[in-house]
């Protein structure tokens, strides 16, 4: 998981230069920043690397490091037993994700973003600032900039046929990133509302259930050695 940096964000927001040593199973945060997954090599980066600034997010007053998401697969990280993750690593997430396919749940949402209102049924949503999520590189596109004051938004519509489900998979994993079932855009602020509380995950941890979520970007908030 990649939760350690986000847990301390509120305390270090006084502006300090951070070092990060990855110790999780997937390590999206380290992968995005180009930090070695080897702990000794990562420690060396802290001493002889360079300082980089990157954006963080705020969801209903809670700081997060690189991703806030709801829907399909998002409970995998914190529901997968730690001993299983220790043994299988990234494969543990894959196995748990496959279980979710048998219980696809949709959410009817009203989304306010970039002076536009959208309404529809979605099975997955992700607001992120990362080149890797769940161990999948470039899932948010190839033009991700970590310090541009914008986060990438990915919304997956509810499929009503096997063909649409196939289009979703292709849209998320293919390099052209285009699918009628997957909406993508950038923003510095988004509000998502629903009639019922929706479970969220934040940096791989339980983010609680919310009927209304407001997410905004804190531009170049953190300095880190890379």
What does each of the following model-derived ranges do?
Residues 113, 119, 145, 155-226:
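ATP/nucleoside-binding phosphotransfer catalytic cores, i.e., glycine-rich phosphate-binding loops
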Residues 84-91, 141-160:
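Gly/Ser/Thr-rich active-site loops/lids in small-molecule metabolic enzymes
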Residues 69, 73, 126-142, 206:
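Glycine-rich phosphate/pyrophosphate-binding beta-alpha loops
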Residues 74-76, 119-121, 133-136, 161-164:
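Short acidic/glycine-rich loop or secondary-structure boundary segments that cap or lie
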Residues 14-127:
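Catalytic core of DAGKc-family lipid kinases
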Residues 2-9, 13:
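Single conserved hydrophobic/aromatic residue that forms the stacking wall/gate
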Residues 105-107, 121-123, 147-152, 186-188:
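A generic structural signal for short beta-strands and their flanking turns/coil linkers
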């Amino acid at each position: 998981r990649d939760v350690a940096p986000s847990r301390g964000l509120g305390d270090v927001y006084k502006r300090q230069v951070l070092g990060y040593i990855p110790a999780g199973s997937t390590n999206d945060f380290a992968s995005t920043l180009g930090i070695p997954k080897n702990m000794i090599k990562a420690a060396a980066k802290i001493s002889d690397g360079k300082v980089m600034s990157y954006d963080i997010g705020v969801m209903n007053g809670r700081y997060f490091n690189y991703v806030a998401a709801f829907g399909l697969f998002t409970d995998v990280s914190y529901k997968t037993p730690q001993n299983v993750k220790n043994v299988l690593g990234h494969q543990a997430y894959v196995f748990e994700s496959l279980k979710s396919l048998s219980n696809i749940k949709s959410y009817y949402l009203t989304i306010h973003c970039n002076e536009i209102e959208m309404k529809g049924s979605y099975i997955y949503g992700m607001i992120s600032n990362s080149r890797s999520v769940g161990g999948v590189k470039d899932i948010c596109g190839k033009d991700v900039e970590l310090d541009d004051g914008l986060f990438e938004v990915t919304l997956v519509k509810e499929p009503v046929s096997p063909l649409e489900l196939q289009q979703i998979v292709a849209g998320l994993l293919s390099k052209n990133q285009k699918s009628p079932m997957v909406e993508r855009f950038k923003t510095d602020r988004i509000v998502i509302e629903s009639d019922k509380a929706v479970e969220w995950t934040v940096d791989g941890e339980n983010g609680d259930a919310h009927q209304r979520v407001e997410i905004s970007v804190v531009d170049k908030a953190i300095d880190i050695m890379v």
